[in-house]
Each structure stands twice: as structure tokens, then as C-alpha cells.
Amino acid sequence: MSAPAGSPHPAASARIPPKLGGAAASGAAAPAGPGPGPHQQNGPAQNQMQVPSEYGLPPQNYIVPSGHYSQGPGKMTSLPLQSQSGDYYSGLYTVPTQNVATPNTASQQAGAQQMYGRAPPAPHAVGSTPGSFQGASSSASHLHTSASQPYSSFVNHYNSPATYSASSSVASQGFPSTCGHYALSTVSNAAYPSISYPSLPAGDPYGQQMFTSQNAPAVRPIRDNSFSGQNTAVSHPSPLPPPPSRQYHQQQSLSGYSTFSWSAPGLPSTQDNLIRNHTSLATASNPTNTVADSLSCSVMQNVQPPKSSPVVSTVVSGASSTRMPPAANRPVEPVASVTQPSELLQQKGMQYGEYVNNQASSAPTPLSSTSDDEEEEEEDEEAGVDSSSTTSSASPMPNSYDALEGGSYPDVLSSSASSPAPDPAPDPAPAPAPAAPQPSKMPKPFGYGYPTLQPGYQNATAPLNSGGPPSSPVYSGFQQYAQYPGMNQLSSSLGGLNLQSSSQPESLRPVNLTQERNILPMTPVWAPVPNLNLDLKKLNCSPDSFRCTLTNIPQTQALLNKAKLPLGLLLHPFRDLTQLPVITSNTIVRCRSCRTYINPFVSFIDQRRWKCNLCYRVNDVPEEFMYNPLTRSYGEPHKRPEVQNSTVEFIASSDYMLRPPQPAVYLFVLDVSHNAVEAGYLTILCQSLLENLDKLPGDSRTRIGFVTFDSTIHFYNLQEGLSQPQMLIVSDIDDVFLPTPDSLLVNLYESKELIKDLLNALPNMFTNTRETHSALGPALQAAFKLMSPTGGRVSLFQTQLPSLGAGLLQSREDPNQRSSTKVVQHLGPATDFYKKLALDCSGQQTAVDLFLLSSQYSDLASLACMSKYSAGCIYYYPSFHYTHNPSQAEKLQKDLKRYLTRKIGFEAVMRIRCTKGLSMHTFHGNFFVRSTDLLSLANINPDAGFAVQLSIEESLTDTSLVCFQTALLYTSSKGERRIRVHTLCLPVVSSLADVYAGVDVQAAICLLANMAVDRSISSSLSDARDALVNAVVDSLSAYGSTVSNVQHSGLIAPSSLKLFPLYVLALLKQKAFRTGTSTRLDDRVYAMCQIKCQPLVHLMKMIHPNLYRIDRLTDEGAIHVNDRVVPQPPLQKLSAEKLTREGAFLMDCGSVFYIWIGKSCDNNFIEDVLGYPDFASIPQKMTHLPELDTLSSERARSFITWLRDSRPLSPVLHVVKDESPAKTEFFQHLIEDRTEAAFSYYEFLLHVQQQICK
Amino acid sequence: MEAVVFVFSLLDCCALIFLSVYFIITLSDLECDYINARSCCSKLNKWVIPELVGHTLVTVLMLISLHWFIFLLNLPVAAWNIYRYIMVPSGNMGVFDPTEIHNRGQLKSHMKEAMIKLGFHLLCFFMYLYSMILALIND
């Protein structure tokens, strides 16, 4: 309904609260405007936030006419280029010039295909002189070394610079683009045409080859190595093959997780080689070269193999022979040498930048660049700057960034499925033979190749080569290789297997639970690391944000069913991260069919195409993606940050918005009934808001508003220009309207004074209220109307059962049933009002966060729906009172501080994708599932966790890796549309033993807890409890009957599952699921809500608290955090047997800390830490540790502070004396002990054992 | 009289068939993400009661007109409809709840159910048609 314009609604009266003083009633009423109607119309449609299905703007920056180069020779002079490049480096970029140059070149090179065609000419240039060659190698070595530092694996790849160089020289050939350049510039155009044509066809096949021919090409590099110290034209032919090898390498690396073993072992030797080569080469090469090299190094780390196809190679060889003349270049040796590095670079990374520089430096030769090029360069430069700046925002230092990325291209992995089959076929003659020897598992021809090269290189004898590219040399190379790094490589190649075999024993070691007395480890339990090769491990998503219950995914649903373990994911997608690469680019590269974001686990088939790791579709690499903003190099798609980090954030373009990004809008809906005033939360809230008003996340558009309600609804007009806030009262709660829709949500900065006035006045405005009713429903409807034009966050503070208007609730709790062991009713909502409203809110991008501060039953089960489905969060402060319950008050204060200042994302959607064959069927958390894999999150906060259950729909036999990707699209508080992408990669296994070996017991427990909550709401609590027990019984009996062949009388579990029964018992004794112990319904429901929406780390503490003994803290094993020494006492099992009267213990329950003081606790401790002379004088209620200047106090406090800092919500500290009544609170967390209503741990084990034997 | 009963049943059955088809189409729309869960469920929930009434009516009619076989055939389906309606938890928005339809394979089971009903109604349709013709001839 609408209020009559210009006059207050009949029901609305302006009341001037005493404090607010004299704003005229008329003034208040005057603005009364149109009813809510228009707002709703304005509201975005529900679908709004869906990610647009199409992306793909053409990469604008890099579109360059392909014909470019051909023009080159005639037009251009190198000089201008030089000068430009000089400017680049010196002025704009701190980065070496070569890098700088890259963008330019990149743009120039845009047309890949053409580049290929040109390739053949390149050999000329390369082939020319040994000297040049050396130079090249040196550069390569440089690169290698630099690259190698971060990752050992990386080093392996590149082991010997020499090979590299050789290959690089070759590469020039292989790499059409560079080659083309070269040919044009340096040598003979005449040669070019003939050669080039053959090469072109090669280019096409090449893609395929790349893919298939891994083995053969790989070998070649080796051969190259062997042969050619100094490669003359003759040697060149051999070099040609190498490019394929490189490709091969890449592919392997991609494909290879099976293969990946290349890791550390080879390193030392290779490094040495590298260094040696490097130095020698460097000396040989011109100073210019060295400079260039050094410059290039940073850029070059990841080299993509040139794509010459075998066909090409043959052709090239011919060409090369013809090219022999290029030696003519030599006269210009210095130049040539210079150029070569560039070639190398190009080969590696296709770095055009260097190339350009080289050209520039080698002034004499006619270069292809033209004036056009220059212009383009400038443009590119800008682009480069942009990108660099953005990346820098993510991580200030490019170097550090690299460190972050760490893995160089070896990392780029593809699912093995794509790569595994070696195919000899595509390769011309030479290839096939080598192919056979290398099983797909033997990963890296890559790594091999290089080491072998070195020796060859050093010898500088070409004998092997003489044969040319033929296969025989390949063999030799291969063998050499085998001998050489031999053992290391073998072991590394078997790495995957080894890892498994080594890890299996531990995680599969049978444990007799009934005999193992101390099952709980002394240190915190860490997430198991998926059994992947090293490179993948490094790249994989942090377990803090993304965990799977089974780190080895079973191949089939049948296998999963046999294992009787839950399969699912636990997500913490919006976690506060200290380091997060932020990427800005015009095109966000995604799979065309499944829309997966490009990630470290895709495979690059060649430089122009990548294969999606979720749906296996082959996609094109957009031009823009060829340029790497971090290194400012071109042609290294595998080195882009997207492909180097499994957690990245994109700045999304307008394609990802259906409306302009919304501002941050905060609305506070406050209960001001008598009950609320009595509890006194308003003071704390207003105080906290006043303190944090400037820290609210947002930009200049941030808006804020307040609504209070008792039996009527009060709005506050805070329009700028008013002298005081005006209160507008709407008493027509059956048909709520907004009295002045425009001035209720006001700009935070424009109206800051008014807001502060209001916040100062609010706590005292209602002190004398007699109103006991609460019209929550209508207030929420009003809030919805207020928020629907923009969306945002509604913070609702409620202190009692809503008793008026829509959504009123009845008390459903029967106090006598609190400790019933039979039926616990009313776990579900009583009405669908809140759910409907939540869905409306969700549709308008509004989330409702509920703060329930009540001393009596408030039907949280119904109220929570409001937050559950609008993606809000829920806080519950039972028996809150600001004076009677100071610990709760303090907790509220601290929680509010975090709540108000933490990051927030608006109008978010989250999509979870997984490899074809897997499907998600149930989601847990606070959100609305809008379609099968799309979660609609009106708000996202860093403390929200999610869980997803998975099933295996199709057999995964044809793949060895599965990936999961979550993409969270949200609007940041600054009005930026961003996408945060996490990708997790896990191996697939076919044996039950492997499945058990990979169980992540904590994740499994958390997922089970989520499932149990669902079960207890939809069915009954006892069903849920039975299901939990059955989960243990089933999985252990399945293990016992299938995997373990040890015949014991005891209860056998694999080591990976040894904590499973303990955790399940803990769950059964958790507030949410316990029976027999008196539990208030709201407490229980709140515990369930927390299980649903807490991230794993926090949930685990809720389920299984940590117990430490703190009266004897020592610095042994202490860690240093921010200059503080934090002692790390061992974990104690949760049993009274561990409590001694002489000790003091700290229990960390997530949201509560208990310090239990034994009766005969050492007086020194009591005095030093608690500040009281003896046990008797410790007060009953103590919630703080005094800051005493003693060592033990310092230790205790730093330990507690450290624990506190690890979680978003500040826990309350209770000091519990041994004899105080509060000790029951403490003792009920000792879950290994027996209580009246529940098993002890040992009894539980016996019970499980009995069930198994049945 | 007999003919009238079957004519009515036939019409009712036609309506139920259309309804089943509508359910299937809407659910598959949801499956393909053409509509969102909210609108899908509100569309479908509207028709749950008409379907229930329509089917119960035929069932009762068959009981009254003493067609035991057809009555017994219809009984389980009618009972299921009623059971399903009654068992909706108080917090849900109807038989189809947008917040749960994507969970635990509910969408699939709804789809399956609609399919089965479609088959059942088709069967009934021909039975009614046959009985109607028979009745008309007998008249």
C-alpha cells in the first residue's frame, strides 16, 4: 500500500522522542511518499546474478595483423625500436628491458598460425655460430637457474641449460614465430618461402602431435644435447626435433601427474651443470648477451616448447642445411649472439619482448619492425602497465609473486587422461622409436633431456648429430639419460607410486582401537595431503579453503558404496587470505562448454589450446592470455597466474553483472521492546557501531539505516540536512509501508553526524518502555521493502519470541522434554513465513543476519530460516544480560567488532563444478540453491563454510585425476565485481585400500555432522544418531572385511580412520545431537545451525574440543608469532583421567575456553597466572586472566591469545574451579568419559564392535 | 448412469494427464535451469491440491459406483497423494519446497513420481474409455 503523498499515513504518526528533541512532526511526515511498490519494481529479478553464460570478448590488446612481419624487412630500422625499448626499461619499468619489450612483441606476434608458417626460416639465424649458440645457452642457463630456485621440480625440467640452449637454437626453428622473424631479418628471404610453406602444414599437425607424440619428441632433446656442443648448420637439423620434445615436456608435465615424479633427485647435478654452463657460456657470449640473459631470466622461467611438428622438423632439417650459409651472420657475431638469446627466449616462452630487443640491438640487420609496430608497442605498453599494476596489487613485488607461483610450467598439469597415450604416429620417422621406451609414467623426457644435453654440449662434439634428427641419436640420448640421472630419475618417475606405497603403510596401518589407549595424537590433526605428485601438491588448493572427505576419489560409485564413507567437499571459499593473486584481464578464460575457469590443472595441448580438466573439451587460448602480465612476457599461457595458482581472484567485467554493482548497504533492525531494553544490548551495539562506523567495509556510496520495533515499527529519517534524526512510527503492522522511502537509508558519509546522534540517543530512548510485544515479522517486511531496491545486509537483533503480526510464533518447547532420551521435537521451523521472506530477500540480494539475545525460548528453529536461506549468519547469546552476564556482553562486543569490520561480499553466487562423472546432490550451509550447482548468496562473509555431498554418476576409470572448482562471484564492498576461484585436484584410485588410505577423517566427520543435522530435522534426532553410529559401524566393518586381513579380536581401523569412532562419539555428545542431558531447544538448534555453516576448522573444535595442560607451559617446541613466544603444549585426551588435581587445564571448545583449576593446583601457578594467593580465593566467576608480569602468566596469556586469534569470533573464557557448580559445563566436554546417558569411549568401541560382529 | 460416471472419469483423467505433463515439463525446466526453484515450486504447489482433489474424486466415485477393481487400482495413488500432502513439514512451503528441491535428489524423485503418475493416468484413461464405450453400448 502507499501512503498518501505529502502527508503521513493515517497510521503513521511522528513521535519526537525526548532525546531527539524538536524536529517538527510535520517535517517528519512530510516526505511520506510513494508506497513500497516502486521499490519492488526496481528490484532486480531473481535471476540477476547469474553468471552470464557467455564471456569472451576478443582480446583487444593483442590483435595484430598477421601480415606484419612479412613487411618488416623492407620498412624498418632497428634503431627506433632500440630507443623505445630503452625507454621502456629505464623509465617505466623496473623490470629488465627485455621483459618490457615483450608486450610489444607479443602484440605483434598475434597471429599464431602465421607465425608457425614462418618458422622454418629461423633455423638460419640460430644455426649460425657456436658463439651465438653459447650465448643462447647462457641465457637459457640463466633462466634455468632462476627458475630452479623456487622449485626443484622446475629445475629438473630444465636441468641442463645446454640442452636448453640447444633446443632453443632449435627452438627458433620450432618456433615459427620467432623463426619467421629471424629469417626475414637476418638471412635469406629466398630460403624463407620454400621453407616456410612446409612448415605451415606442420603447424597444423603439430597440435595433434603435441598431444599425442609425447614420447618421441621428448627423447629428442636429449639427443640434441648429446650431440652438439657447437652446432653448426648441421647440428640444426637435430635441434628441430627438440622443440617437439619441449612440447612434449609440457604435455607431459601437463598430463603427467602420473609422470610427475621428476622432482628433486636430479636437481643437484643439474644445477651444477646449469651453473657451469651458464658461466662458461656467459663468458663466451657478449656482454650484451649476458645482460639480455639476466634480464630475460626473470621473464623466462617457463618456456613453452616451440611447437614444431615432427613434420616440421624434417622440413627444417632440410632447411637448415640450406641455411648453413647463415653462418654468414657470424661476422656480426655479437649481434647474432644477442639475437640468439632472444630466440631462445622465444622458444621457451615465446618471448617476443626479448626478441625485439635483440633485434634492436642488432641494428645492422634489417628487422621486421615497422613504425606501426612502434605504435602498437605503445599501446601494448599501456596494457602491460595496467596488468602489471593489477597484479602488483595482489602482490606488490613481481618477484614475490613468482615465488608465490612457484611452480613453473612443469606445474601445468593436465589430467592424465588426455595425455597418456603416446602416439608415435604423428611423428615422422625419428619419433616413433623413442616413444616406446618412455611410458607415460616416466614422466619427463623433459627432465631427462636436459641433463643429457649438457654433456653433449660440453663436449661440443657433434658426432651424434651427424646423423641428423634420426631416431638413433634419440636412443642414445635416452640411454644416456638413463644412466645419468639414472637412479634419481627412476625413483622420481616412480614418485607417484612411491608416494603411495610409502604413505599407504602409515595411513593404512591397522590400528586396534580397543587396545590403543592413547588414540589422540599429541599435536593437532592436519588434513591429509592428496597423493599427487609434488608439482600438483604445490599447486593444489589449501585444505583450509577446500577439502574433500576422501583425498583419493574412488573410481566408481560401487567402490564408494563398498567403502561406506561419505564423499563430499567442505568449503570455506571466502576465507580471509593473506595472499591472493588478483587478476584483471579483459577476457576471463573459461571452458566454452562447462564454463570452468582456467586453472592449474588444465592441460595445454599446445600454446594455443588448452583442455578443460572438468569436461575435457579443447578450448582456444585467447590472444590476451598469451601475454603474462607478471613477467611481461608473451607466449607463456602456462605461466599466467591463473594457471599457477589454484586460488585466484578475477576482477570481472560487465559481462558478469546484471546491474551496476550495488553499494554496501547496511540496515540494522533492532528489537526495542521491554525485554530488549532490559537485556541492555543496545548500549553495546551502539557503542560498537560508533567505534566502527568508519571501518564498515564500503566506499563513498555506503548507505546505512536503522529500524527499531516493538509492537510498532519505528523508522529513522537521517536525511542529510536535518538538524536531528527524526523518528517515524508506523503502527499499522498488518500492512507495513515505508513512510519516507528515500531518507531512511542514507549515505554514511553525508549523514554521519546524524547517525552518530542517533546512535548516542538510541540506548536511552526506550528506557521506560512498557511495550512487551515484538512485531518481528512486520519489521522484517519493512526491512525487506527498504532494502529491495539495492540489496545489502540486514542485521536483526531480536530478544524474544515474535508475538505480533505476521510471523508470530508460539512457544513450542516443553522444558520437561529437555533431557528426554526419546523424541526431540520442533527442530524444524513452525511456519514458512520466515523462509518465504528469506527467499524474497535472497531474490533481492538482501541477507539477514540474526543476533538472538534471549533468555527464554525464542524458537530459533523458525527464526533461523530467515538467515539460512538468505545466506546470512546466526549468532546466539543465551541468557544475555549486559550486567548479569558480563562474559556474554563481552562476547557480543567482540563479535560485533568482527562482524562490523570483516570483509563482505554482496549479491554473490557460488557455483561448484566437478569433473564429469561426479555430481553434487546435497548442499549444506546458509544459502538458497537456485539451480543444480548454483548457490545464491545474497551476502558472503569470511566466516561462512559450506559442505557439498557428491556422488559418482559415471565411472571415472578413464581419468586419474578429478578436479573440483568453486567460483564465487560477488560484489566487493568497494563496488567491484570479483570472482574468487578455488580449484582442488585429487587422484582417482581403484582399490578399496587406497580409498581408506585417503580418508580425511575431520572432513568426513564434518560432512557427517551436516548430514545428521538434515536427518534430525527431516526425520528425527534418534534417526540421526543411529545414522552416525552406523557410519562408524559400516565403515569399520567394510574395512575389516575387505582390506584388512589381520584377524584380531579387537576393533581394527586403518590409521587414517582411527579417530573416526572418537569423533563420532564426540558428535553424539555434542549439544546438537546429545540426548539424556538437559539441553534447551534453542541451544540445540543453534548448535545445528553452527554445524551447518561453520567452516571445518572451527567446527572441529566444537565437536572435539582441545584440552591442554597449562600449569607447566614451557618454551619447548614453542612457535614465534609476532615476536611473541607461543608455547605449544601437547593435546590431552578428553578424559577426566588426564585431569589431575595438581594441574590446571585449558579446554578450547571453539566459542568457549574453560580453564579448569584443580583443587591442589600449585599455588605458584594460581598466584602467577590468576593473581590470587591460593585456590580458595579464586572467585567463582572469573573471565579474564590478569596481566601479570610473570613468565608463566605471559606464557599462558600468549597461548590463549594465540588460540583466540585463530578464530573469527572471540571465545569467552571461563575459569572453572574444581568444586564450582560450573564444572559440569566443563566436564560435559570430556567426551571420552561416561555420562549417565552416554557411553564412554571404550564402551562405545565395544558397542561398535558388537554391531560389527552381528 | 454408468456412462455418465465414466464420461466424468474420462474428463477428470484427461485433466490429470495434462497436470502430470505440466509437472514433468516444469520440473524438467527446473532441471535445465530455465526457471528458478522458487517460481517452479510456487507453480507446482498451486496444482498439488487440484490434483489431489481430482484424483480422490474419481476414486470415491468408483467406490460409490461399485467398480471395485478400478477403485482398488486408484486407491494407492490417491492414498499416496494425501499422505504426501499431509506429511509436508510445517516449515515447508508445500509439497515442492524451493529450498530443498535440489537436495538429496528430490528433483529426481519428483520427476519419477510425475512420470509414474502419467503412466498410471494414461492406463486409467484407456480403461475409462473402454468402460465408457461398453456402458454406452449396453445402454
From Swiss-Prot, chain B:
Domain of life of the source: Eukaryota
GO biological process: endoplasmic reticulum to Golgi vesicle-mediated transport; protein transport
Its biological purpose: Involved in G protein-coupled receptors (GPCRs) trafficking from the endoplasmic reticulum to the cell surface; it promotes the exit of GPCRs from the early secretory pathway, likely through interaction with the COPII machinery.
Name the record gives this protein: Protein cornichon homolog 4
Membrane spanning stretches: 5-25, 57-77, 118-138
The encoding gene: CNIH4
Entry GO CC: COPII-coated ER to Golgi transport vesicle; endoplasmic reticulum; endoplasmic reticulum membrane; endoplasmic reticulum-Golgi intermediate compartment
Lineage: Eukaryota, Metazoa, Chordata, Craniata, Vertebrata
Species: Bos taurus (Bovine)
InterPro entries named among the record's database cross-references: Cornichon
SMART domains to which the protein is assigned, alphabetical: Cornichon
